[in-house]
Amino acid sequence: MATKLTPFLMRTAVRAATRLSTKPSTIAPVSRACLSISARRPSDTLMVHRNTPDNNPDIPFKFSADNEKVIEEIIKRYPPQYKKAAVMPLLDLGQRQHGFCSISVMNEVARLLEMPPMRVYEVASFYTMYNRTPVGKFHVQACTTTPCQLGGCGSDVIVKAIKEHLGIKQGETTPDGLFTFIEVECLGACANAPMVQINDDYFEDLTPETIKQVLSALKESVTDVSKAPQPGPQSGRQTCENAAGLTSLTSEPYGPEVTRSDL
């Protein structure tokens, strides 16, 4: 049956195509889908290393004497045959000493842990906390995930305030080398949204005014450490307590409970 139908279907299709080709087209042109492409994340922009004057294998790197002692303690935590498991803390240590996780830092970590350099590169290129390009003294990372977009004044307003105050766009560093700004995904402080991580500190419950105050204070702290801003909520609340204040566990705590009264 299928064999008999095939010639018929082919003839029908050819005739239909011929008619369409001889008549003016009445079919509306198909519009191309408009794709929305977000800005490239700095963590995605360097999946392959490219030598630069400030980041190439010819630049020597060695851990300081103090960090060598720290490395000895770190490696002791792992069995000798599995010391390569220390790759992440050693990369972090190298980044803190050098300012960023350069190719020379990765090669030195590979040498110390006796593992192929490519394995170290894989780790450093996978985790976004390793900065494989130079960053400023203050690495400003604004969370733009849903809770921060919806919480408080919203992360869009915070991002705009940062860009205006620093005069840079995402992924850029200020001319004085003090600030690098990027947008990141959730940093786990959703109850205190919107928030920003700067180096190792969280600044939460932000408004355009408070984030500008934080950035100004950080700049002043370069010459006067006492000017450094206090991390945490900038709204005055304690950690992540309810905005309405304490609503539970308001009474004095009971004493330790025991199973037997004679204990």
UniProtKB/Swiss-Prot annotation:
What does the entry's cofactor note say about binding and number? Binds 1 [2Fe-2S] cluster.
Q: Which cofactor does it need?
A: [2Fe-2S] cluster
Its EC number is 7.1.1.2
Which InterPro entries does this UniProt record tie to the protein? NuoE-like, NuoE_dom, NuoE_N, Thioredoxin-like_sf
The record's GO molecular-function terms, alphabetically, read: 2 iron, 2 sulfur cluster binding; metal ion binding; NADH dehydrogenase (ubiquinone) activity
Q: Name one Pfam family in it.
A: 2Fe-2S_thioredx
Superkingdom assignment: Eukaryota
Instruction: List the biased-composition ranges (Polar residues).
Output: 233-251
Which reactions fall under this protein's catalytic activity?
a ubiquinone + NADH + 5 H(+)(in) = a ubiquinol + NAD(+) + 4 H(+)(out)
Protein name per UniProt: NADH-ubiquinone oxidoreductase 24 kDa subunit, mitochondrial
Which species does the entry assign this protein to? Answer: Neurospora crassa (strain ATCC 24698 / 74-OR23-1A / CBS 708.71 / DSM 1257 / FGSC 987)
**This protein's encoding gene:** nuo-24
